[in-house]
Amino acid sequence: MKTYEYILSATILLVSICGCARKNAVATAADECEPLFLAVRPLPEGGYSLISLSPFDGSRDTLIISRPLSRLIVMSTSHIGFLRAIGGEDAIVGVSGAEYVYDSTVRARIGEGRILDIGYDASPDYEKIMALKPELVLTYSVSPVKSQFLTKLESLGISTFTVNEHLESHPLARASYVRLFGALTGNMSAADSVLAVVSKNYQALRDSVRALMTVPGDGPQSADAEQRICARKILVNIPYKDQWFIPGQENYLSHLVRDAGGEILGSEPGTSISGQISVERAYSLSKEASLWLNVGWCRTLDQLLSVNPLFGDFLMNIQKNAAANGFGSASGSDSAGSSASVGSSASVDGFVSAGGSASVGGSASREGSASVEGSASAGSSDSVGSSASVDGFVSAGDSASVGGSASGDESTHADGQASPQVIWNDNSRQNAKGGNDFWESGVVRPDLILRDLIRILSGSTPATQLTYYQPVE
């Protein structure tokens, strides 16, 4: 089962040899995904042709689907997230690394023996795989070298298909793989509905932030001409095996942070590949940062300080900068635009308030085909948008201003001065073994991740209103 600590490279997944198939499915996402192409092409006689292009050597993995598949082995928890989003989880008969599965429904089926753990691709249980009689094993690639696992499966006559969504650099491009799973399971209508709503939500949130970052009437956007509300400067990550990675500006996380109104410090322009920095360089960046995101496995400050006691100095630098810029300060002022709010013309949930366009909210659907409605609030249930329900955002009245007043996410020093909450991690939804729903359901719900980040960057939202993130305190 693949897990993610850092995104180190990017990929392109092609679906149609000659054009972009996204136009038929989700017009609103087309501008986000170029020059990416979705790997699903309908066939005249019915079914779909799937084409996956390796970012490493350009080799193609092709598959013809003439009927819905009902027996799948999935080698990544992200595959579970896609299938759950469209109500296709019944097709799962095997997983890799069952202890890292977050979704409670799939975990329950594992406990009942309805879904089996076939082991990891480095040491799989081939007898168990054969006994499951899978119609398809969904794999992923991390290098141009064909794995022994794939070679062995082919020799056993077992069909495989490579899914490289984890290497896509844009959040909506990554989410668009839900259509691939729709093609596999006969749930294309559900997949299109999911992607349409997620794309609409994401773009509305991003556009709300952009409206605050640019003063109307500036004319064509340019770095010199436009007046901007300052992007919040952010330090990300901690050392992983003594290497501190900073994602490039075209990286998945960088897109999310930028669309939320932030700037990752030390990020190299023009690349999605992560670069390495020293702890000393990271300390220097902490003197500029007012927020620290994605601190590895840490859930508490004590755990963070156990990694490196110097991180206490990082924290003081970042808290000082956050307070100086009005983020979560005792006074509640915000030099980055306290009068502007994502909720002023559109709610932070991405929907225009009363009198504007309709909210996507409604009752949650857990049966049958996909519902583009739902009323699940952030983090309120174990499964986000499960069983083909695309939970809509709560509408007006639950907005968080970008640059608003403090809301209690603060600690207090002995001198009585409030310290802003400046360290947040993406492990709010994590099981006892470390299986993280950020990389499971979050892959198909970048709109919810973006909403979290907007609320965090505003410095004015309680942790209870977040889905995937939580404060480290």
For each of these PLM feature ranges, what is it?
Residues 327-414:
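Long, intrinsically disordered low-complexity tandem-repeat segments
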Residues 273-281, 285-326, 414-461:
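C-terminal soluble interaction/assembly domains
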Residues 200, 205-212, 228-307:
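Flexible, glycine-rich surface segments
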